């Protein structure tokens, strides 16, 4: 027996059962004073919130005659509410002590409570719902049947009642019996008959006969009130079947007691003989309460226990304070009609928990007489022969089963055997695979942790350099170098180990491929059989599940490490910011602050406020170079297992990149330098314009650089952009056809069939290729073409950059003024453009001479600079000259 069981056996176990309300209580609608909180806690007379008559005002002592609620909490070993069944009570009370009873310990179960609280129903029950006594007998004989091959068990039962302080035998018609105390047997009832039933049916019949002889009379409280205390006792004697000179015999006694309920004559209306019965019942229960109080009071040593004050307490002497394991079932009523009885029952039950007893198994060692030796020897010889026969039968049965198994293996389907063999191989492979994978993920986590710690150490050292003195910086530098060297050494060791684990994983993958190819030989058309395919799929799913759980654990560890660093950083910031603000205002008040310091303080304020800053794509970020810490997405990402494809047996080692992590780059626009910053050289122009996307064949692209001022005249090669719907209305139909035919380099020869301007375009392109042969070929014949200067698309001189159609900033008024200023400074570069050798158009900017009404015509002329046919006449639907406008 374990130590826990011994501790429980030394203390009385107390349970409480709350019965449902009867018809009378429901009719009168008495309030409930007992509330079951859970399986162990019970609340008696709890406080209830009452709605006050006055709105928003609580009245105190409104009814001075009203009784205050006790609001008591009781804790017991088990609490059963109104919905509990007889089987539940038996499972938690008597059934656990049956094992102790079979081991030779005395056990007692008794029901205690007021009249009408449900004690008799709990112990005896009815035909539809049998009680604890009936269920105990069934389970006891069931246990005896299980051990009958090892031990000889004999049972004896007795049934008595204590009526008006007299003991009567319920199984026979006898007079009052006397109580004696024996030094060896303990308390003994002289003249009590013992019956030896052979089965559970016989013992239940005896129990039924005894209940019929029990004294019961109706009262005003209970129609079937028990007027006596009933004690049902079972004696069990166990002896080993093995013949021996020294026999060990176990003798135990179990007592199942149904006590009569305490009552008050004013409530029960008892008169005459009923009044005498009630007086004796209360006397015996009072003596029982005094015994419980004396046993529960462990502070006083050598205290007198008043067992002799009643016949009932004398019978329960062994059960309460002797060598016995006792369980008390306290039955209570939830109604306020039995308020005092319920309170007294709970009070005595709570005290009974403190009663302790010393348990001892009743094992007797019987030495046989010398005259019995011959008989014992014969019994042992017979037992030896019986055991030999059993052993022989067992060996024959085992040999027969082995032959049957061999026959099954011989006659079984070869495919089934192969399937079982492959299943075992898959189990072994995936067990190794799971271990290797777990080791790999662990190494990956340790490497990430080392990288994170290294970055934290470097960051901490930078902060120390900015804050501390030189002596402390030197010490911190030595400490940092030592830690970084240690982390580096550890990381190198982990990397080597990681490579070894990766090789092991590759070997396991090769073996898995070989097994899959062998499994394909079993199936039809080179497919794996369905059973093996399901088995393989289950193994993969199980491996993925284990891997995800491991990754979650590793992510939690890394997150904890990062959270610790964040807390330290937050503590530093919380300490520095108030000091910085205080120093700033001190300098401000004394006038020692300058503009640079104010600007720095404003920048810090912006950082603290977390304001968002809009920046162009080509502008450099000051904090971009300070990203020493690894990203959270990269930190929390572990290498995933890719689906394994089956390969032939002769294939070499599988892809070693299975375990490698594929970096996920953040999508961003390709930054192109601003064309205004390009130097006027052929090489630089070609290097910046090689293999750009074709703007004719694709949609409009957003601007990829920040427009900037141009202070010097530079030779520009504006990119060909797809004209929008607004510019298409200004361009003529011939120029649109020419632009559409430039979409593919292979179709440039077809341009000769169209307008004359297209031949000029092709010639200019060929001239450009001959002039710069080092230009790289086109990336794609359909998706992109080289962006060439706009001068090759016209026979006139090229326009300056300010005269071109702006791509983004042209829609703002400020940009228009900017380009007008640039046009005056770029006219000087027009003459230098004529020396390039290409046919160009030149339109002079006369915006300063002409009136503002002609700006509309001038803009239309600017957008038609991409015309390729110089002989075509410009046609306008409306003449916008000065005379027509007026």
UniProtKB/Swiss-Prot annotation:
Per UniProt, subcellular location reads as:
Cell projection, Ruffle; Cytoplasm; Nucleus; Cytoplasm, Cytoskeleton, Microtubule organizing center, Centrosome
Molecular-function GO term, any one: microtubule binding
Q: Which GO terms describe its biological process?
A: cellular response to estradiol stimulus; male meiotic nuclear division; microtubule depolymerization; microtubule-based movement; mitotic metaphase chromosome alignment; protein transport; regulation of microtubule cytoskeleton organization; seminiferous tubule development
Pinpoint the Kinesin motor domain residues: 11-355
Which positions does UniProt annotate for ATP binding? 113-120
UniProt cross-link Glycyl lysine isopeptide (Lys-Gly) (interchain with G-Cter in SUMO2), position? 24, 683, 782, 862
Q: Positions of the region Disordered?
A: 774-804, 862-886
Per the similarity annotation, which family is this?
Answer: Belongs to the TRAFAC class myosin-kinesin ATPase superfamily. Kinesin family.
Q: Quaternary arrangement and interactors, per the entry? A: Interacts with CENPE and ESR1.
The protein's name in its UniProt record:
Kinesin-like protein KIF18A
């Amino acid at each position: 027996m374990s130590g826990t069981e011994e501790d429980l056996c030394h203390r009385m176990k107390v349970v409480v059962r709350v019965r449902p309300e009867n018809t009378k209580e429901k009719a009168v609608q008495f309030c409930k004073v007992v509330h079951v909180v859970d399986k162990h806690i019970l609340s008696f007379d709890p406080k209830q919130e009452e709605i006050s008559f006055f709105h928003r005002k609580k009245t105190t002592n409104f009814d001075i005659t009203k009784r205050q609620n006790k609001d008591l909490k009781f804790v017991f070993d088990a609490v059963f509410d109104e919905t509990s069944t007889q089987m539940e009570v038996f499972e938690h009370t008597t059934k656990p002590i049956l094992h102790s009873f079979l081991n030779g310990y005395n056990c007692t179960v008794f029901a205690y409570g007021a009249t009408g609280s449900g004690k008799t129903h709990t112990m005896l029950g009815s035909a539809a719902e049998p009680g604890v006594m009936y269920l105990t007998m069934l389970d006891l004989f069931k246990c005896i049947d299980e051990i009958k091959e090892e031990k000889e068990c004999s049972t004896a039962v007795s049934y008595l009642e204590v009526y008006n302080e007299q003991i009567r035998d319920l199984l026979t018609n006898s007079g009052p019996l006397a109580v004696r105390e024996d030094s060896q047997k303990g308390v003994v009832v002289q003249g009590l008959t013992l019956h030896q039933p052979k089965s559970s049916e016989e013992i239940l019949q005896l129990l039924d006969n005894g209940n019929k002889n029990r004294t019961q009379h109706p009262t005003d409280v209970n129609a079937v009130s028990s007027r006596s205390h009933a004690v049902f006792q079972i004696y069990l004697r166990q002896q080993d079947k093995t013949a021996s000179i020294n026999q060990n015999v176990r003798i135990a006694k179990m007592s199942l007691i149904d006590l009569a309920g305490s009552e008050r004559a004013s409530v029960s209306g008892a008169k005459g003989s009923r009044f005498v019965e009630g007086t004796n019942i209360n006397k015996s229960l009072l003596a029982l309460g005094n015994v419980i109080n004396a046993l529960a009071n462990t502070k006083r040593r050598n205290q007198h226990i008043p067992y002799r004050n009643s016949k009932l307490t004398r019978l329960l002497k062994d059960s309460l304070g002797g060598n016995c394991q006792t369980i008390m079932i306290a039955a209570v009523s939830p109604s306020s009609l039995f308020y005092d009885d319920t309170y007294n029952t709970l009070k005595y039950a709570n005290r009974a928990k403190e009663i302790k007893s010393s348990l001892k198994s009743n094992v007797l060692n019987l030495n046989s007489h010398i005259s019995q030796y011959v008989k014992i020897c014969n019994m042992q010889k017979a037992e030896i022969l019986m055991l030999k026969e059993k052993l022989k039968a067992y060996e024959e049965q085992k040999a027969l089963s082995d032959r049957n198994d061999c026959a099954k293996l011989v006659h079984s389907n070869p495919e089934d055997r192969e399937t079982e063999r492959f299943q075992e191989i898959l189990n072994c492979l995936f067990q190794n695979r799971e271990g290797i994978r777990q080791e790999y993920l662990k190494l990956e986590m340790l490497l990430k942790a080392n990288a994170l710690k290294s970055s934290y150490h470097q960051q901490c050292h930078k902060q120390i350099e900015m804050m501390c003195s030189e002596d402390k910086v030197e010490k911190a530098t030595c400490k940092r170098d030592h830690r970084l060297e240690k982390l580096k050494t550890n990381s190198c060791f982990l990397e080597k180990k990681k490579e070894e684990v990766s090789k092991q994983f590759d070997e396991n993958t090769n073996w898995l491929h070989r097994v899959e190819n062998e499994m394909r030989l079993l199936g039809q058309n080179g497919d794996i059989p369905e059973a093996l395919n399901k088995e393989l799929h289950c193994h993969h799913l199980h491996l993925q599940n284990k891997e995800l759980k491991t990754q979650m654990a590793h992510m939690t560890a890394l997150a904890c490490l990062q959270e610790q660093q964040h807390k330290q950083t937050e503590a530093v910031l919380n300490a520095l910011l108030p000091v910085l603000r205080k120093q700033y205002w001190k300098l401000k008040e004394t006038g020692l602050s300058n503009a640079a310091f104010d600007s720095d303080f404003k920048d810090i304020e912006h950082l603290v406020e977390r304001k968002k800053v809009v920046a162009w794509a080509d502008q450099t970020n000051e904090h971009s170079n300070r990203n020493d810490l690894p990203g959270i997405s990269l930190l929390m990402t572990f290498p995933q297992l890719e689906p394994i494809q089956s390969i032939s047996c002769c294939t070499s080692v599988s892809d070693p990149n299975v375990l490698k992590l594929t970096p996920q780059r953040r999508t961003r626009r390709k930054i192109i330098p601003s064309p205004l910053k390009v130097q006027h050289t052929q090489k630089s122009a070609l290097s910046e314009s090689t293999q750009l996307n074709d703007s004719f064949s694709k949609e409009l692209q957003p601007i990829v650089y920040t427009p900037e001022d141009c202070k010097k005249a530079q030779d520009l090669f504006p990119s060909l952009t797809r004209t929008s719907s607004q510019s298409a209305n200004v361009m003529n139909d011939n120029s649109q056809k020419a632009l559409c035919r430039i979409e593919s380099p292979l179709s440039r020869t077809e341009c000769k069939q169209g307008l004359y301007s297209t031949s000029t375009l092709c010639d200019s392109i060929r001239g450009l290729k001959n002039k710069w042969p080092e230009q790289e070929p086109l990336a794609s014949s359909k998706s992109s073409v080289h962006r060439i200067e706009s001068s090759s698309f016209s026979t006139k001189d090229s326009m300056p950059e300010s005269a071109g159609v702006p791509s983004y900033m042209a829609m703002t008024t400020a940009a228009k003024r900017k380009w007008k200023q640039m046009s005056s400074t770029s006219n000087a570069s027009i003459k230098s453009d004529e020396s390039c050798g290409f046919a160009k158009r030149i339109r002079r900017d006369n915006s300063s001479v002409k009136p503002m009404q002609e700006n509309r015509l001038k803009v239309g002329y600017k957008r038609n600079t991409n015309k390729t046919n110089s002989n075509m006449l410009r046609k306008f639907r409306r003449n916008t000259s000065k005379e027509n406008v007026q």
